A protein has these predicted regions:
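Generic secretory/membrane-interface signal
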Residues: 4, 20-21, 207, 238
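Bacterial N-terminal signal peptides
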Residues: 11-22
Length: 273
């Protein structure tokens, strides 16, 4: 295939994805306004619920090392933004404040927990916070409470709490949804897309702070990227990077977030009666 033809195929693929789920500039969520609850008054939230916004989204992120080129709050910025996109597409949702402390493993975990700035919650503590947040929102009149997590360790606790509360509240008219496909299916779709479109291997894309993660933060919060520090695998074995962030772009980030949000919506709709 010639270079021109390859570029044409790549452009067509990108265009098709954008048509499926457009994210034009005016659709970018504003975290300092509704439907983000921390930017609303209690009376505005009350009136929104009374007006039919009875879905609550609880995003979970993380405070972890992301190499020399990317800020610690990567997951928080991405999942807060993605929750806004999810709320837009559902049309009847409000967003709780993002939980920024999540399980990150042992405090002294080599090349991870021992890096300055990493904050880790034990699984039981994380689950207690989720449990309390969901119970609080139930009291206020939300009928469907969504949990989405931007990091792998978040998924287990989300699933556990959703299962326990759904069993406890069976028949009460309130459902808790752990939308793990946002993370689990989302990352598979992103990886496959990058392989088919650019020919990039899974190793090149990486599993942490590589092409996908860096692209998403470039799209959501470009100030969180230190471009002069980007290097394949962070430039050293102890950098905390798996993959090649130099391949990242905001365009890829936009597509990646679309994949994740679409996977979450599909899972949510499949669970509805």
């Amino acid at each position: 295939m010639t270079t021109i033809m390859h570029r044409a195929v790549r452009t067509a693929t990108l265009a098709a994805l954008v048509v499926v789920s457009p994210l034009v500039a005016q659709d970018r969520p504003d975290p300092y306004a509704a439907p983000y609850m921390e930017s609303m008054t209690w009376t505005e939230i009350r009136d929104a619920i009374a007006g039919g916004k009875k879905v609550a989204i609880i995003p979970t992120g993380g405070t972890e090392q992301n190499g020399p080129h990317m800020v610690m709050g990567k997951h928080n910025y991405i999942v807060t933004f993605a929750a806004g996109v999810l709320a837009q597409r559902l049309g009847n949702a409000l967003i709780a404040p993002t939980l920024q402390y999540v399980p990150e493993g042992d405090y002294n975990r080599p090349n991870w927990g021992d890096k300055p700035g990493v904050i880790s919650l034990p699984d039981p503590a994380y689950e207690k916070v989720l449990d309390a947040a969901v119970r609080s929102l139930k009291v206020h009149g939300f009928t469907d409470i969504i949990l989405i997590g931007d990091s792998g360790p978040n998924q287990r606790g989300m699933t556990s709490i959703a299962k326990a509360l759904n069993a406890e509240w069976g028949g009460a008219g309130v459902r808790v949804h752990a939308l793990t496909d946002y993370y689990e299916q989302g990352r598979i779709l992103i990886r496959d897309y990058l392989n088919k479109t650019y020919g990039w291997s899974e190793q090149m894309v990486g599993s942490h702070a590589g092409t996908s993660d860096t692209s998403q933060l470039l799209y959501v919060f470009s100030q969180g990227i230190r471009k002069d520090k980007m290097a394949p695998n962070g430039g050293s074995p102890d950098a905390g990077v798996q993959g090649d962030p130099t391949k990242a772009s905001p365009e890829i980030g936009k597509i990646a977030i679309d994949f994740k949000v679409n996977a979450a919506i599909k899972q949510f709709k499949a669970a509805m009666p």
